[in-house]
Amino acid sequence: MKFVDSASIRIEAGKGGAGCLGFRREKYIPDGGPDGGDGGDGGHIYFQGQEGFNTLSEFRFKRLFRAKNGQPGSGQNKRGKSAQHLTVEIPLGTKIYDLETDELIGEMIEHEQIILVAKGGFHGLGNTRFKSSINRAPRKTTPGSPGEIREIGLELSIMADIGLLGMPNAGKSSLIRQISNAKSKVANYPFTTLHPSLGVVSYYDEHIIMADIPGLIENASKGVGLGFEFLKHLFHTKALLHVVDIFPVDGSDPVENFLTIEKELKKYDQKLAKKPRLLAINKMDLLSGGDRETVVQSLLKGTRYNGKVYRISALNGLGCKNLVAGLFKLVKENE
């Protein structure tokens, strides 16, 4: 599964501080020479790679990033203070483009990697700089140069091996938290997941990436709800994991919920509907041993599903180790 998230922002590096026009004026030195100091440099703007981010959503709300200007110089040859540089954190895997030239500025690969994207302006020169044997009282100064201003495009691409299917609030976010390092927000209401949540699942010394896409609803194949914006991403997964809540909080029928998801996949694309998958039946911890098999068989009969089934609890981890082993096996079989 390849997620492509994008954002456009404007960055403005700081302007250099102006040089000072000044002359030394002391009690016993009425005609002192120039003493105007240089200004400070403007702040650069850097991007820094940070683990733990998986979308560019925050850049849809904040689109302007501006570094501070350098301070002007002053008398007694005092230089203005240079501005602090501005560092903007972005997710690993993000490509950085100059939108005006289409130039690829760089790609964020490693945690805490630094990329300079806009240089601050150079400091202005005070009149002391222009003193010479010919001109002992120069009145010339220079302003600080402007900082770089760029229109920046950010593009984040992340590949996932397993895509999670399920109705809203089926327990997918809880499951991905249980078996991976993801920190997806979890609450007891539909549409908990509003953005793709990705987690790295480890099994001995191997790793796969699992993607929890927003829960599907009826007519998602027509764009209803969160629609086919996320359905289309399922094409590039190696396999799918369908999570069914055996006790939905909205009182809906687990069999109908399963069939709704399958129907939407078939309506969207037949090849997608035939993609290899596993079924995880969630909240099995709420049933006693004898009742579990009765409920599972009733679900399988109603859905006519005949593939591999895992009885799990995303909350307390019941059956999750076996599920992880099954996922790794499925991914290897479909590489």
From Swiss-Prot:
Pfam family name, one: GTP1_OBG
Domain OBG-type G span(s) in chain numbering: 160-332
InterPro entries per record: G_OBG, GTP-bd, GTP-bd_Obg/CgtA, GTP1-OBG_CS, GTP1_OBG_dom, GTP1_OBG_dom_sf, OBG_GTPase, P-loop_NTPase
Enzyme class at the top of the EC tree: hydrolase
Assigned EC number: 3.6.5.-
Gene Ontology CC: cytoplasm
Entry keyword set: Cytoplasm, GTP-binding, Hydrolase, Magnesium, Metal-binding, Nucleotide-binding
One Gene Ontology molecular-function label: GTP binding
Gene Ontology annotations of biological process type: ribosome biogenesis
Domain Obg: residue ranges: 1-159
Residues reported to bind Mg(2+): 173, 193
Residues annotated as binding GTP: 166-173, 191-195, 212-215, 282-285, 313-315
Cofactor: Mg(2+)
Compartment list: Cytoplasm
Major location category of this protein: cytoplasm
Function text: An essential GTPase which binds GTP, GDP and possibly (p)ppGpp with moderate affinity, with high nucleotide exchange rates and a fairly low GTP hydrolysis rate. Plays a role in control of the cell cycle, stress response, ribosome biogenesis and in those bacteria that undergo differentiation, in morphogenesis control.
HAMAP family per UniProt: GTPase_Obg
Recorded family membership: Belongs to the TRAFAC class OBG-HflX-like GTPase superfamily. OBG GTPase family.
Quaternary context: Monomer.
Listed name of the protein: GTPase Obg
Lineage: Bacteria, Pseudomonadati, Pseudomonadota, Gammaproteobacteria, Candidatus Pseudothioglobaceae
Gene name of this polypeptide: obg
